[in-house]
């Protein structure tokens, strides 16, 4: 057993020989006879504590994270008490196992990312919409798309709920292998900063990486904007990425240009010029039906109607357009199908009354960062004839620094604000709201209704048919997390219920 893997560089090749094993997993509860169990030291718990469980459930081989980089890849003495010979299970410790896991899973699942076009989208906001637009567009042109991200993982239109935007290194490779098996030839994948910082996508072969924007988020994890930006940039400079598309209207993208000389740039500034290949909007007209967009590009010019609302969605659709053009798609075919692209669930989604009563317009959006809330309210204002109301809260156990910032934005851009619960999780709802309230210049004008359904009901009851209500923060989510329990809750369902009364 000692020095079973004498050279660290042989690890992936060795894993390829394990293909006859049924599966590899990080969860000891999912282990069955003959499986490969990965025991990682995680951020919340140490998977090595469950090695005994995995052995008892029939694991054939266990890779366990070594205590230090200097540890040899060998049977560690701390596991000797498990009587491994009797159980015919090999336990091997591996230095930097978390960093290597993506490559190990890539070998185990026969490099699925090389068998389809893989596009990675990263940024604070816009990842989901851009990914969904890419998948839709590819399908409209006769392809077979899959998506991975916040809404879920699966073939486009058949997504299954995902716990994280970017799953574990094993889950990502498992999903890609399944997509290939199901006939997908294209995958649009949201890539989170957590996923990048934790090496979950390290071995993926990206045909294209897209950067949407960067603003404050996840500082509870990254601690600084600089660290957050560095995690995002890994998709462009540290991984196997063949081409890049950047939102040139974001300052962070400008900072990256010297390091990405071949990047394709997207801008909504008609005066934008660049030596890079580009796509830019030259004219945009907004209406309740969406937006009319004229553009120029290195591939030619065109115009089309988009069903999506908001200036930020003009950026998202142009990022998708630039991405597909970069991959060699035909401009004329893209323009001809652009008007068929549908809005994304929970992204500036219109909610209508079941009856034809005169009721306010309600938009549900996932905006849960200061930048996203600002852009959503600015977009909503374009469609508001009367007053603009905003219903929002902030998630518990997450970056608390953004709470007063979102309050300031809501107060500045909306005519009326109701503060309510988002997903309080294990944090006290009163503490969350108190921190939000610190951002209001005139807190006496702000209504606080902790119960989210009652907050939505109040907004609809007191709004006129000329008014618009933006319900922000949860978007596509059909649950509310209170404590550690997920309760069924849908902003769309609740809004539709009270609009129809």
UniProtKB/Swiss-Prot annotation:
ATP binds at residues 123-129. One of its GO terms (molecular function) is magnesium ion binding. A motif (Meso-diaminopimelate recognition motif) lies at residues 422-425. Coiled coil: none annotated. The keyword Transmembrane does not apply. GO terms for biological process: cell division; cell wall organization; peptidoglycan biosynthetic process; regulation of cell shape. It is found in: Cytoplasm. Meso-2,6-diaminopimelate binds at residues 398, 422-425, 473, 477. Pathway: Cell wall biogenesis; peptidoglycan biosynthesis. Carboxylation is probably crucial for Mg(2+) binding and, consequently, for the gamma-phosphate positioning of ATP. Keywords: ATP-binding, Cell cycle, Cell division, Cell shape, Cell wall biogenesis/degradation, Cytoplasm, Ligase, Magnesium, Nucleotide-binding, Peptidoglycan synthesis. The keyword Protein transport does not apply. It is an enzyme of class 6 (ligase). Its EC number is 6.3.2.13. It catalyses: UDP-N-acetyl-alpha-D-muramoyl-L-alanyl-D-glutamate + meso-2,6-diaminopimelate + ATP = UDP-N-acetyl-alpha-D-muramoyl-L-alanyl-gamma-D-glutamyl-meso-2,6-diaminopimelate + ADP + phosphate + H(+). Its cofactor is Mg(2+). Pfam families: Mur_ligase, Mur_ligase_C, Mur_ligase_M. UDP-N-acetyl-alpha-D-muramoyl-L-alanyl-D-glutamate binds at residues 26, 28, 43-45, 164-166, 192, 198, 200. Belongs to the MurCDEF family. MurE subfamily. Catalyzes the addition of meso-diaminopimelic acid to the nucleotide precursor UDP-N-acetylmuramoyl-L-alanyl-D-glutamate (UMAG) in the biosynthesis of bacterial cell-wall peptidoglycan. This is UDP-N-acetylmuramoyl-L-alanyl-D-glutamate--2,6-diaminopimelate ligase.
